[in-house]
């Protein structure tokens, strides 16, 4: 999202952003409070946010000089990364927030602007790690010399991110201790699509069998909101668990739910 050739936002280079500020400031039905940007997803360092802050504060200074418009809020958007696999190393939110404040403060001092109220949108960073999806193994297919395909009772209807974004996840055998060595496996769904993949490359025990449970971590962001009833598959329930027990937040869909909107 952080370049010119996208459908989002107003171009700084073409002057569209400053024109949007002018129109908002001139509209009596609007109260212009500040600027917002969004630079991407799964961001693990502050370099991109630093560039965004520099450009936004520069725009705030330009709006003050050219339009006599003062703004008091600066939203640097979302995109803060989380750990889907071992190689992902996100910065803790508290230290990241401190660094972002330092960046904005330095830019404001450079342009002689008062420090605005700074906001970020850590949606994925908050809810992503809070959910684990548990699947039941249906079939296991060994392709000699290549890999093992482990089919589960879900797939792209409850998590389309692997097929859509080539997203990667960590998966673990959840119902017992493994008894065999590890081998390369691909966890796939039950849908009639070759791209219906849950985890593209995973090291799973060779004794994995139908009925085993696989836990896929960090599925709290976007999976449920992007879920569908493709192939007329009901969506699974969402269950909250803590030290005191569990409770259902969203019930499992039924086949009656799938037909509820049919009127013909």
Where are these regions (language model features)?
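Active-site-proximal beta-alpha core segment in soluble small-molecule metabolic enzymes
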Residues: 1-73, 82, 103, 108
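Structural preference for beta-strand elements that scaffold enzyme active sites
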Residues: 7, 31-36, 71-75, 115-119, ...
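Conserved residues at the C-terminal ends of beta-strands
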Residues: 38, 77, 217
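Charged (often Lys/Glu-rich) extended helix/loop segments that serve as interaction or gating elements
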Residues: 99, 105, 113-264
């Amino acid at each position: 999202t952080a370049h010119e050739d996208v459908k989002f936002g107003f171009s700084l280079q073409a002057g569209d952003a400053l024109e949007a500020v002018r129109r908002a400031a001139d509209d009596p039905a609007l109260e212009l409070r500040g600027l917002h940007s969004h630079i991407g997803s799964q961001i693990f360092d502050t370099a991109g946010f630093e560039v965004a802050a520099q450009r936004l504060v520069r725009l705030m200074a330009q709006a003050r000089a050219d339009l006599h418009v003062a703004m008091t809020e600066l939203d640097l958007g979302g995109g803060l990364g989380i750990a889907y696999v071992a190689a992902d190393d996100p910065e803790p939110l508290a230290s990241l927030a401190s660094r972002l404040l330092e960046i904005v403060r330095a830019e404001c001092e450079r342009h002689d602007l008062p420090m605005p109220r700074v906001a970020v949108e850590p949606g994925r960073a908050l809810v992503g790690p809070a959910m684990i999806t548990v699947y039941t193994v249906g079939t296991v297919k060994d392709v000699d010399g290549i890999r093992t395909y482990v089919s589960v009772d879900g797939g792209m209807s409850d998590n389309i991110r692997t097929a859509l974004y080539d997203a990667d996840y960590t998966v673990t055998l959840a119902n017992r201790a493994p008894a065999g060595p590890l081998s390369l496996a691909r966890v796939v769904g039950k849908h009639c699509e070759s791209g219906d993949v849950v985890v593209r490359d995973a090291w799973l025990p060779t004794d994995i069998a139908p009925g085993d449970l696989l836990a896929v971590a960090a599925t709290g962001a976007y999976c449920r909101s992007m879920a569908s009833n493709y192939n007329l598959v009901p969506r699974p329930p969402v269950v909250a668990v803590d030290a005191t027990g569990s409770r259902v937040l969203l019930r499992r869909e039924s086949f009656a739910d799938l037909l509820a909107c049919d009127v013909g």
